[in-house]
Amino acid sequence: MILCRGLFMAVIGIDLGTTNSCVAVMEGGDAKAIENSEGARTTPSIVAFTDSEVLVGDPAKRQATTNAKNTIYASKRLIGRRYQDTRDIKTSYDIVSAKNGDAWIKVRDKDYSPSQIGALILEKMKETAERHLGCKVEKAVITVPAYFDDAQRQATKDAGKIAGLDVIRIINEPTAAALAYGLNKSDKQKVIAVYDLGGGTFDVSILEIADGVFEVKSTNGDTMLGGEDFDHAIMEYLMDDFKKSTGIDLHSDAMAMQRIKEAAEKAKIELSSRMETDINLPFLSSDSTGPKHLSLKLTRATFENLVSDLVKRTIEPCKKALKDAGISADKIDEVVLVGGMTRVPKIIQTVKEFFGKEPHKGVNPDEVVAIGAAIQGGILAGDVRDVLLLDVTPLSLGIETLGGVFTPLIERNTTIPTKKSQVFSTAEDGQTAVTIKVFQGERKMANDNKLLGQFSLEGIPPAPRGMPQIEVTFDIDANGIVHVSAKDKASGKEQAIRIQSSGGLTDDEIQNMIKEAESKAEEDEKRKKFVEVKNNAENLVHSTEKSLKEHGDKISNADKLDIENAIRDLKDCISKDNIEDTDTMQNKLDHLMKVSMKLGEALYSNTNNATAGDNNTTDTGSSSNSDGSKVVDSDYQEIDKKDGK
C-alpha cells in the first residue's frame, strides 16, 4: 500500500476508549469519523484470542460468551498501572503481576502488557483509516483521559509505537471534544465545561474559547469511574437476585458472568430511552434439581438507585475544576456532554442541576473525541490554521525532600508545555550523591502520591550539608510527558532522564513487541489468504459437483473422470485444514477449474446447437426473396414531417 501524500498526508485522530474506540481524519476542511469493516463508526475495545487467530472489535465481542477467559475488555483501565492498584478490578480474564510490578494480562500460557492489547485495537483503527483513504497511514494523534498520569500517558504512546504508529501528540479527551465543539463557531468569547463520562474514566475540564484560542483553565477527574462501574452495579444486583432464588453464586462462573455482563450493558442502554426492561437469561446455571434461569424486570428507578453513588462521584471533580479555574457554575456558558454514559437520563439531570443549565447535546458523544483528535492532527500537519490549543497538566509534579515531604515544582493545571527549575541541597555532611524521586499527585507526603521514577546524581564534591547547590529541572512536553534533570552547580555534573517509572516498558521490550506485532500481522495475512482460498475451493467443489450431477451425461467418460478426480483431490486438501497447504490448495483449485471447463464447453455447445435448430423453423408473417433471404413484413404509417405529426 502506498504512503499517503499531498492532500492525504493524513494524521489520523484516534479515541482509544475503554469500551469503544473511534478513528477520524480531516477531509476537505472537516473532520469525519470513519466506518470500520463492519460498517460502524465505533469499534468495541475488545480483543479475543482463539485457537487460530486474534479477533478485534465486533468479532471478538460476538464470541465473548463462549471464550470469556481469553476475551480482553476494558484493558485501558490497566494501562500504565501497578498490579497492586488493580486488585479491585473484576474481570473474566486473569490480571497478573509482571516482573516489574505492573498489571499485565494472562491469556492461556502467555502474559500481555495492556499496551500490547491497546496496540491491537490501534492496529484495527489504523487499518480502518487506511481502507478509507486507500493509502498507508503512519502518524496519529491519540487521546487519553485528562486525569491520566505520566505512566499512563507513556504506556498509551508505547501502544501506538507497537501498532506501527508515530504518535505525534497525546491529547486530553475533554480538550479534543472542545476542539470539535468550537472549531467553526464564530461566537463571542465563551467559557465551557466538558463533562466526559466514558466507559472507564471520568474527566471534567473548564475551557475558555475565543478567536481560535482554546485555553484549558483547569481539569479534574477520576480514572476509575465509568460505564464499566455502572454495568458492574447491575451485574451485582442480578447475581444477588439469582443467588436468593437459586442459592447459586455465579461469581466464579466465567461464562455466566460474561452473559450477565452483556445483559447488564444492554439493560443500561435500553433504560436510557425506556422506563423498564426485561432481562431473560435461560439456562444460566444448573444444580442437582435441573437448569436455572434468570428472568426479571429492571426499572429505571431501580437502576438509578443502584448507581446513585456513582453519579454523585462525578460532582466533586466538577467542584474542584471550577474552584481551580476560579469560576462559579453560573459563569459557565455551555456544558458539553461527552462519552456514551452521558445519554443516561440521571446523568443529564445531575449535570443540569449542578451547572444550572440544560447541557449542550449538539455533538455525538461517541465520536466527538476522535474528531477533535483529527482536528489536532490537522493543526499539527498545517491543514487547520488560526487555531491555538493550550492544555494543562492534570496533577502536580515534584520531588521527595527531607522527611518524606512532597515538594511540588509544577502545580496542577499549569499550561503545557512548561519548564521549571528549583535549587535544592544535601541533607548530610560530605554527601557525594543524591537520589531524586519524582512524584505526581496532590498529597502533602511523597509516599501518598504516585512515584513516577527515580535517578541518582553522583560525583558531588564533599561539603557541609546545605552548601551544595543542586538544580532540579522539570520539563513537561505537549504530550504531558515528563522529563527531569538534576545538575550540581559546582562540578557541572548533570543527570537527565525521561521519566520511566519502576514499571513501564523498556525500549527493548517495546522493540520486541513491535517485532511480535509485525510477525502477527504476517501470520494474520497468511491466515486470511488461507481462509479465502479455502472458501473459494469449497464453493468451486459445491458448484462443480452440482453441475456434474445435472449435466455429466453431456461430456465424455474420460472428461468426467478427470473432473471427479480433481474434486476428490481438492476435497482431501480442504479436509486437512492446514494453513501450510494454501499454495497446494490453490493449485488444486486451479486444476479443477481447468478440467471443469470441459463441462462448460459441452453445455455451451448444446445450447448453441439448440439455438441453431430453432433458427431453421419457418416464421409466420415473413416472406422470402429469390436468394432465400427472409423479408419480414411490417405495418407502417407515414408521418407528415411538415406538421410534425
From Swiss-Prot:
One of its GO terms (molecular function) is ATP binding. PANTHER family: HEAT SHOCK PROTEIN 70KDA (PTHR19375). Residues 630-645 have a biased composition (Basic and acidic residues). Gene3D superfamilies: 1.20.1270.10, 3.30.420.40, Actin, Chain A, domain 4, Substrate Binding Domain Of DNAk, Chain A, domain 1. HAMAP family: DnaK (MF_00332). Residues 606-629 have a biased composition (Low complexity). Keywords: ATP-binding, Chaperone, Nucleotide-binding, Phosphoprotein, Stress response. Disulfide bonds: none annotated. It comes from the Bacteria. This is Chaperone protein DnaK. Induction: By stress conditions e.g. heat shock. It comes from Ehrlichia ruminantium (strain Gardel). Acts as a chaperone. The keyword Zinc-finger does not apply. InterPro entries: ATPase_NBD, Chaperone_DnaK, Heat_shock_70_CS, HSP70_C_sf, HSP70_peptide-bd_sf, Hsp_70_fam. The modification Phosphothreonine is found at T201. Residues 606-645 are annotated as: Disordered. Pfam families: HSP70 (PF00012). Belongs to the heat shock protein 70 family. The gene is dnaK.
